[in-house]
Amino acid sequence: MGCGGTSLKASGGSITSETVWNDGANGGAGGGGVSSFFALPSYQEGLNVTRTEGGTQPLRMRGVPDVCGDADPQTGYDVRVDASDTIIGGTSAVAPLWAGLIARINAAKASPVGFINPALYSHPGSLRDITRGNNGSFAAAPGWDACTGLGSPNGQKVADAV
């Protein structure tokens, strides 16, 4: 599972906006794109990729990311490191977010859910679709895109989908 990044804004416990994380001024941005080496998996067949400068074309090779989460260090995760509180971000913070979610889902089910990508692509409504922003080369678009994949998690909906 490839993880992309967003910048999330919230108020009163509710998400007010979520866009592609691309903070060029401070050098941080989520990656994403289309592989030159890995074949298109069956669960990505029929998808398109949208470039930042416009234009959409069929996805012909493996596209990443599959999913995303808050990666902006300005809106990231409160952690304690060496007795100091700090906020971290980056897509390397999104991967453990997803790992933790899947671990919780596994704990709640009778057996492990296994490889969940096909189920997520079959149930894109289980994710919050991110449709604003770009990562430099690719633009967010409805459905899967090469910035945020299918979107960010709604934990209960993801659990129901897998």
Could you say what each language-model-derived stretch is?
Residues 1-162:
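Extracellular protease catalytic domains of secreted zymogens
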